Amino acid sequence: MKPSDVRSKAFAMPLTSPAFPMGPYRFVDREFVIITYRTDPERLRAVVPEPLQIAEPLVHYEFIRMADSTGFGDYTESGQVIPVEYNGQAGGYTLAMYLDDHPPIAGGRELWGFPKKLASPTLHVNTDHILGTLDYGKVRVATGTMGYKHKELDLDEQMKRLAGPNFLLKIIPHVDGSARVCELVRYYLQDIKMKGAWTGPASLELAPHALAPVADLPVLEIVEARHIVADLTLGLGEVVYDYLAQ
């Protein structure tokens, strides 16, 4: 294979059978349970990278069911998103996500810089409530419950919330172990079609784990819970801050 062939085909590894396809990445009937809670502000400051700023000491704990996604297939994801501001623009910073499917792990890390790790999350209706769980190995590190469709939410308002900016810290090492890429990336969810949004009573329990430290941001108070179903496209990102150029 000639160098020009390598350049023309280079998108993802392995070269001859990439771990994930080119986009666009469309999700149909993507289901979210988002439990917002108040936590320790000092612990938040210790994990949120500047120039992002914390507005309130809140965390969105998310369970996401994605049964129909372009190129990525059928999978479930769980993790923590922190409300932040960047140059006065409100958005969400993804601290860590845990999922059970290799293509979105590889694609998420390599394309956008999603901090994804392999684990075993679930999300399903359990009689009269929605149950979300996250197991890392044999340890249950997160359990979330929410009353099933107790009260409808305004779809336009929820769509605006989903359409806001999201931020990631993309890190790719050089072959010598030093940082080759260290960037703050911004991306958006696009072409959103809302199919339903509800709220209700919720609970969230987090347990300590050395390699899935969701409990490092402790639950002090449940502030809000949302159950959302939507079709959407995961837009590609843009670099807003290069740490290596500073």
From Swiss-Prot:
<keyword id="KW-0210">Decarboxylase</keyword>
<keyword id="KW-0704">Schiff base</keyword>
<dbReference type="InterPro" id="IPR023375">
    <property type="entry name" value="ADC_dom_sf"/>
</dbReference>
<dbReference type="GO" id="GO:0047602">
    <property type="term" value="F:acetoacetate decarboxylase activity"/>
</dbReference>
<protein>
    <recommendedName>
        <fullName>Acetoacetate decarboxylase</fullName>
        <ecNumber>4.1.1.4</ecNumber>
    </recommendedName>
</protein>
<dbReference type="InterPro" id="IPR010451">
    <property type="entry name" value="Acetoacetate_decarboxylase"/>
</dbReference>
<comment type="function">
    <text>Catalyzes the conversion of acetoacetate to acetone and carbon dioxide.</text>
</comment>
<keyword id="KW-0456">Lyase</keyword>
<comment type="similarity">
    <text>Belongs to the ADC family.</text>
</comment>
<feature type="active site" description="Schiff-base intermediate with acetoacetate">
    <location>
        <position position="116"/>
    </location>
</feature>
<dbReference type="InterPro" id="IPR023653">
    <property type="entry name" value="Acetoacetate_decarboxylase_bac"/>
</dbReference>
<dbReference type="Pfam" id="PF06314">
    <property type="entry name" value="ADC"/>
</dbReference>
